[in-house]
Amino acid sequence: EFMGKKTTFAEFMERIDRTAKAYLAMGIGKGDRVTICMPNCPQALDSFYALNRIGAVSNMIHPLSAASEIKFYLDFSKSKAILTLDQFYGKVAGILPELENKDTVLLVARIVDELPPVLAVGFALTKGRKIPPLPKKGNYVLWNEFMRVGRKRDLPLPKELGRFTDCASILYSGGTTGTTKGIMLSNLNFNACGLQTIAASGFAPINGMKMLSVMPVFHGFGLGIGIHTALIGGATCILVPQFNVKTYAELLIKKQPNIIPGVPTLFEALLRAENLENADLSCLKGVFCGGDSLSVELKKKVDAFLKEHNAEVQIRQGYGLTECVTASCLTPKDYNRVGSIGVPFPDTYYKIVKTGTTEEVDANIEGEICISGPSVMMCYMDNPEETEHTLRRHADGRVWMHSGDLGKMDEDGFVYFSQRIKRMIVTSGY
């Protein structure tokens, strides 16, 4: 659901196939990379799944990135095309002549095309007026024209299914050592993350539930849980393109979602939202926090807030890295240990090792957090040295991802995060 416009699963599958045919008509095929430089909106989701449908790879980046950063991501990923919104046209068009691939196609979508008629008129008269008009002749392809060519050519979609080992998407992170890296995530990584998250939720199945999807699609948390977990579980994603506390609070009241994932700053803002004062939040089944540490004090405040508003749930902290899509550890339902980030997801293993080694330490001893399981990344793109440093085979025969985070595990398997080994500054998605 986007701005009140609803799409059924059957309609979404049709949209994916139509978008896949449009990418084929553009010349995109198996293994090709396309950059998606978009907020949470329908064209971004259509493209993410359509590219996967034809065996191509989505390269997910922040639409508010500086022009120089966008150039870096396009060159680094060897993208054949970039999808962005009309409001970012000038920034992206300006770097096209500087790209290594001079044939990179600029595909431009518009939010207004996906709005219900009444909202579309309102948008055109308000926010739309602030968006500079696109040049009549320019080095870009409008989304609607792109889709029209796809319909006209009507190329057959590939019959062979993708493999679980195929790369689905590239996300970016400071990695476990602090420098920007492209993280190659497979079909298995995304599907495992989704199934594990649902299993760990404690309230499966989630079909028919509603998730307020505000975490951005260029982050593992937003894409892996806010979108993919919800969709493979049969839940509705209510897409929120940008966080604004007043709008978000209104959506909570109006849409009555069952699941809300967010970062600590989002929940801090909700505590101050005046329009939630008398809200009934008994609809909530899962309130999940990740992306940064949830302080003991903030957890107490949010739990009290939820109770005051008739919600029978606690805020549950998760932990993970983009190197395993997103979360791989979660506070159990109806249970909490103070300061803990929870227990590992089903089919995922955690161990704590002496920093700089593969030697496991005893319970309650601090060391580096290591993770093994089906959501662990394929590799860092074109960076075998960092991949080798991060993914290591231990004496037990398993490949373990060394997180670069310090923590400990108690006798019952509850994990506690301390800090980054190389402390990095963490900011919100927008």
Task: Give names to the regions the model predicted.
Residues 1-41, 45-49, 66-71, 75:
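Conserved AMP-binding/adenylate-forming core of the ANL superfamily
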Residues 20, 24, 42-61, 70-71, ...:
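Hydrophobic alpha-helical segments in the ANL/AMP-binding
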Residues 23-28, 150-165, 170-213, 235:
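Conserved adenylate-forming
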Residues 25-26, 53-145:
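Structural core segment of the AMP-binding/adenylate-forming
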Residues 26, 359-364, 368-428:
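Conserved ATP-binding/catalytic segment of the ANL
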Residues 35-37, 44, 48, 52-86, ...:
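Short beta-strand->loop structural element characteristic of the AMP-binding/adenylate-forming
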Residues 191-210, 218-261, 273-274:
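Conserved AMP-binding/adenylation subdomain of ANL enzymes
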Residues 257-262, 271-338, 349:
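Gly/Ser/Thr-rich phosphate-binding loop
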